[in-house]
UniProtKB/Swiss-Prot annotation:
The gene is FRS5. This is Protein FAR1-RELATED SEQUENCE 5. Residues 87-179 form the FAR1 domain. It is found in: Nucleus. A zinc finger (SWIM-type) spans 584-616. Expressed in hypocotyls, rosette and cauline leaves, inflorescences stems, flowers and siliques. One of its GO terms (biological process) is regulation of DNA-templated transcription. Residues 299-395 form the MULE domain. PANTHER family: PROTEIN FAR1-RELATED SEQUENCE 10-RELATED, PROTEIN FAR1-RELATED SEQUENCE 5. Induction: Up-regulated in hypocotyls by far-red light treatment. Belongs to the FHY3/FAR1 family. One of its GO terms (molecular function) is zinc ion binding.
Length: 788
């Protein structure tokens, strides 16, 4: 072979500028990065491949071309460009079985152009264990050592002609090379081709995740080695693709939030910045969400499984449940970066918006990153994984078991949902694993290790507002069902989002109306049922009534009597083996049942009610009436200035003026739109109406202010009064006083509302005390009668 044989191995990304090689005028650059600092993007050709006597070879033909030529680097081998040399060495490395990277370079002091490069085996050198570097950053996941001091390399120099000449080649490696069926795992040989990118884009737009997309690619190409990249590469590409895709629409999101805040200063939103100055995660909460949290923020659900748009951008609502058992919002977020730091920022931001009052319990998806963030921000809250999410995963992970054993689903359900104690669950779980030979199943082992955060028997001692883990996800998803789906983009999102909120608000108003105007039908003569019907909302009373009627089939008998503490065994007739045990404190009138329904849901169970029946306790003790379930759940709350102002604004803008005007406007539009002529007339009428409303507002404010000045001046005497009336104030001064008057009126309204709220609170407390006294008197009379 000729000493100066030229290989035109141009990859189509340009040729470095020429320059004479002068060893006395050279700077040296080193690029020996640690593995942690290596770029994710591989060193691979992306344009035309090898160009020789046989013509052009495209990237998918490059390996074949290299195999045909069977070239090996040698001193004196010449290339058209630095990039061509890099591509050649990388192709050689792929054929041999190692990965490459750029190690060092030399630049000309004259013009700064690169005139020498060294490409090395990726295992060249050793890991940089600089003490200061490791001290400055916390290493959470130590990486394996991959540098072993390999000397294999290829050095090239630029000639006067502009071509690049091999000036040094070390062939031997000090480590084993990778076999051909594993070469695609090496970093420098992983590349997502154009057709693969197109397929990924299509599947991503259809809502598929990286794992399912990789499965489709492997099937399409006939094996993972032929795909040419890994699932991590696919995930990184999708993340970058998503980031680029939303850049154009993210401004719409910010504009919307700014406008909402401008319309109502109590609208809360926050945007997390990123290191590259791009927009990060976004959180917002309207005044109603903040007020609802004041009443119902004892338990919260954070759901990231609801993917709202074509970029699979996680729309993550914070939700709870109101006194009608309906899902309500406590704020929403778009999570662009699903990292622990992002979730920590989000939870802290949400907590600040909610006046820094953490919930008693919080439910999230089964995710290790979210769990770490929860532990950091809510260390005192009980964290639960969504059982619905885990059961859905179970169907995916154990699909072969479901198909082979139809009885598995029923057995799994009984084990998880119907066991009454920890011991029963443990025994049933391992019996299930043995029956279906699943002892070694990794996923089942993983969820078993997390059992205290999703299996009901471990969670019943904590309040979750009776949001069943199975029904929870259904109810939250139904909040936006019919409005938001996988094809919704950001430009459409908020219009549909607002429609969903409006629909949910109407349902809440309807439930309030039904509670106040549709008394429930009583099924027993029990004073307790009548009492509950007057206290609970309609929906919660129906739930209580179900438990009360259920006591008719249960018998309660004493199992142990320890003076003030009596234990009762409660069971259906003939089902003593299914008995529950209720411990009743006679002096405090408190009972605890082994089913822990009250602790979990806040609704008293039929077992305790059965004990109350046999002990002649005719009314519910106050301890068992949670205010959050009553029709007065939103009353008697002492507001701070911020929440009071937010609540006043919300009541005025939504429940009174907005609904009234919307109803009248709807009828107006329906009639006016029947013909072109009536439509034109309606437009003119609306324009005139807008002017009239504007004039009326100014006139009303000015009249109010004039009356105020008249009254104030009357105190100081008639002469001063005449001077004030005779000298009109400048427009700018008038506007300032108008604004001042508006602020004073708003403050007066807030104070009046606060006084009214406090008065209602006092009256309600008096009624509660009166009821408690009546109950105690009645119980004393009953006890005296029994003793006689």
């Amino acid at each position: 072979m000729m000493d100066n044989e030229v290989l035109d191995f141009d990859i189509g990304v340009g040729v470095s500028s020429g320059g004479d090689v002068d060893d006395d005028a050279i700077d040296i650059e080193h690029h020996a990065l640690d593995d942690d600092d290596m770029l994710d993007s591989p060193i691979m050709p992306c344009g035309n491949g090898l160009v020789g006597n046989s013509g052009n070879y495209f990237p998918n033909q490059e390996e074949e071309a290299c195999d045909l030529l069977d070239l090996e680097p040698y001193d004196g081998l010449e290339f058209e460009s630095e990039e061509a040399a890099k591509a050649f060495y990388n192709s050689y490395a792929r054929r041999i079985g190692f990965s490459t990277r750029v190690s060092s370079s030399r630049r000309s002091r004259r013009d700064g152009a690169i005139i020498q490069r060294q490409f090395v085996c990726a295992k060249e050198g050793f890991r940089n264990m600089n003490e200061k570097r490791t001290k400055d950053r916390e290493i959470k996941r130590p990486r394996t050592i991959t540098r072993v001091g390999c000397k294999a390399s290829l050095s090239v120099k630029m000639q006067d002609s502009g071509k690049w000449l091999v000036s040094g080649f070390v062939k031997d490696h000090n480590h084993e090379l990778v076999p051909p069926d594993q070469v695609h795992c090496l970093r420098s040989h992983r590349q997502i081709s154009g057709p693969a990118k197109t397929l990924i884009d299509t599947l991503q737009a259809a809502g598929m995740g990286p794992r399912r997309i990789m499965s489709a690619l492997i099937k399409e190409y006939g094996g993972i080695s032929k795909v040419g990249f890994t699932e991590v590469d696919c995930r990184n590409y999708m993340r970058n693709n998503r980031q680029k895709s939303i850049e154009g629409e993210i401004q719409l999101l910010l504009d919307y939030l700014r406008q909402m805040n401008a319309d109502n200063p109590n609208f809360f939103y926050s945007v997390q910045g990123s290191e590259d100055q791009s927009v990060g995660n976004v959180f917002w909460a309207d005044p109603k969400a903040i007020m609802d949290f004041t009443h119902f923020g004892d338990t919260v659900t954070f759901d990231t499984t609801y993917r709202s748009n074509r970029y699979r951008l996680p729309f993550a609502p914070f939700t709870g449940v109101n006194h009608h058992g309906q899902p309500i919002l406590f704020g929403c977020a778009f999570i662009i970066n699903e990292t622990e730091a992002s979730f920590v920022w989000l939870f802290n931001t949400w907590l600040a918006a909610m006046s820094a009052h953490p919930p008693v319990s919080i439910t999230t998806d089964h995710d290790a990153v979210i769990r770490a963030a929860i532990m950091h921000v809510f260390p005192g809250a009980r964290h639960r994984f969504c059982k619905w999410h885990i059961l859905k995963k179970c169907q995916e992970k154990l699909s072969h078991v479901f198909l082979k054993h139809p009885s598995f689903e029923s057995d799994f359900h009984k084990c998880v949902n119907l066991t009454e104690s920890v011991e029963d669950f443990e025994r049933c779980w391992f019996s299930l694993l043995d029956k279906y030979e699943l002892r070694d199943h990794e996923w089942l082992q993983a969820i078993y290790s997390d059992r205290r955060q999703w299996v009901p028997v471990y969670l019943r001692d904590t309040f979750f507002a009776d949001m069943s883990l199975t029904h929870r996800s259904d109810s939250i998803n139904s909040y936006f069902d019919g409005y938001i789906n996988a094809s919704t983009n950001l430009s459409q999102f908020f219009k549909l989002y607002e429609k969903a909120l409006e629909s949910r608000l109407e349902k809440e108003v309807k439930a309030d109306y039904d509670t106040m105007n549709s008394p429930p039908v009583l099924k027993t003569p029990s004073p307790m049922e009548k009492q509950a019907s007057e206290l609970y909302t309609r929906k919660l009373f129906m739930r209580f009534q179900e438990e009360l009627v259920g006591t008719l089939t249960f018998m309660a008998s004493k199992a142990d009597d320890d003076g003030d503490l009596v234990t009762y065994q409660v069971a259906k007739y003939g089902e003593a083996h299914k008995a529950h045990f209720v411990k009743f404190n006679v002096l405090e009138m408190r009972a605890n049942c082994s089913c822990q329904m009250f602790e979990f849901s806040g609704i008293i169970c039929r077992h305790i009610l059965a004990v109350f029946r046999v002990t002649n306790l005719l009314t519910l003790p106050p301890y068992y009436i949670l205010k959050r379930w009553t029709r007065n759940a939103k009353s008697s709350v002492i507001f701070d200035d911020y929440n009071l102002h937010a609540y006043a604004n919300y009541l005025e803008s939504h429940t009174v003026r907005y609904n009234t005007l919307r109803h009248k406007a709807s009828n107006f539009v329906q009639e006016a739109g029947k013909s072109l002529y009536t439509c034109d007339v309606a437009v003119v009428a609306l324009q005139e109406a807008a002017k009239t409303v504007s004039l009326a507002m100014n006139k009303e404010v000015r009249r109010t202010m004039a009356n105020r000045h008249f009254k104030a001046s009357s105190v100081t005497g008639g002469k001063h009064q005449q001077e004030v009336l005779a000298q009109p104030e400048p427009e700018d001064e008038m506007d300032k006083k108008i604004n001042q008057l508006r602020n004073e009126l708003e403050l007066a309204n807030r104070k009046c509302e606060a006084y009214r709220t406090n008065l209602l609170s006092v009256l309600k407390e008096m009624e509660d005390q009166k009821l408690q006294v009546s109950i105690k008197v009645q119980n004393i009379k009953i006890s005296l009668k029994d003793n006689l």
